[in-house]
Regions:
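Glycine-rich, histidine-containing beta strand-loop boundary motifs that form or position
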Residues: 35, 47, 72, 85, ...
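Short beta-strand elements bearing conserved aromatic residues within extracellular beta-rich modules
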Residues: 43-45, 81
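Short, surface-exposed loop motifs enriched in S/T, G, D/E and P with embedded aromatic residues
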Residues: 55-63
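Substrate-binding/active-site clefts of carbohydrate-active enzymes
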Residues: 126-137, 144-284
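The feature marks proteins involved in alpha-glucan
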Residues: 1-32, 62-142, 147-155, 160
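Short proline/glycine-enriched turn/loop motifs at strand-loop junctions of beta-rich domains
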Residues: 36-43
Length: 284
């Protein structure tokens, strides 16, 4: 992995793999945390492994364009964390990781460590045989995982969904499943269209490894997967992207452009780093 190239493309606005650098990655020395916060005076990692503020870990500047990083040894998968950010005015913010790969279940809002290198895909045959489908018909079944079927008061897990959905799809002649947004979101009533975590699979239905298994089972049955994405606006919740480092960063700097009709914040698509953030999310 060429870190210098990833950073260069991220700042230029055309990165498709920013997630290889940013976020929390398990490496030989521990877990490497990297975050973009150009307006911050200081950034710390805090979490279950620091007893939160008691043993906060100060991050280092990777460059003069606002990238901060630190590698922390001896961390376990599923530990929770946030970034503690000191703004230019001296205020303190606690933010979830914009590049978090997993998160706590609402109403909790911390990010969670997950080792994506442990994912084991078994769909090589599907990938090798798939085409652009220009030469054959597609029949797409769209669903909201949280509402398709319920297990008492709870939605189906990915395993339960695979058990019942795959036979239903095959019996009714569908070729693809389109899943409404699976990125993390705080408000159930939004059906996933008001996103807080653009790299974080929502914890409502299971963890990334269980979703890995769901996709493998669908592909093994000859069923394609399409995932809806919301690259226009994001939630205003304090733990999220809004005024991430104390100033407008992911949103437009003026209030008229920043606020959407949905009670959310519009992404500032003029910002090169925001474009890289969204394009990398789509590629992820």
């Amino acid at each position: 992995m060429n870190l210098e190239r990833i950073i260069e493309e991220f700042h230029q606005g055309h990165s498709l793999n920013a997630y290889e650098l940013f976020g929390a990655h398990f490496v030989d020395e521990g877990v490497r945390f990297t975050v973009y916060a150009p307006h911050a005076e200081n950034v710390w990692v805090v979490g279950s492994f620091t007893n939160w503020d008691e043993n906060q870990i100060l991050m280092e500047r990777m460059n003069f364009q606002g990238v901060w990083t630190i590698t922390v040894p001896s961390l376990d998968e599923w530990e929770v964390y946030k970034y503690k950010i000191q703004t230019r005015t001296g205020s303190i913010l606690y933010k979830a990781d914009p590049f978090a790969f997993y998160s706590e279940t609402r109403p909790n809002t911390a990010s969670k460590l997950v080792d994506l290198s442990k994912l084991s895909w078994t769909d090589e045959k599907w990938l090798n045989n798939r085409s652009l489908n220009f030469d054959k018909p597609m029949n797409i079944y769209e669903l909201y995982v949280g509402g398709w079927k319920r297990n008492g008061e709870h939605p189906y897990s990915y395993d339960m969904l695979a058990d019942e959905l795959i036979p239903y799809i095959k019996e009714n002649g569908y070729t693809h499943i389109e899943l409404m947004p699976l990125s993390e979101y705080p408000f159930d009533g939004s059906w996933g269209y008001q996103v807080s975590g653009y790299y974080s699979l929502t914890s409502r239905y299971g963890n990334p490894k269980e979703f890995n298994r769901f996709v493998d089972r669908c592909h093994a049955a000859g069923i394609g997967i399409i995932i809806d994405m919301v690259p226009v606006h994001f939630v205003k919740d304090d733990f999220g992207l809004r005024y991430f480092d104390g100033e407008a960063l992911y949103e437009y700097p003026n209030e008229y452009d920043a606020n959407s009709e949905w009670g959310t914040m519009n992404f500032n698509l003029w910002n090169e780093e925001v474009r890289s953030f969204l394009m990398s999310s789509a590629a992820f």
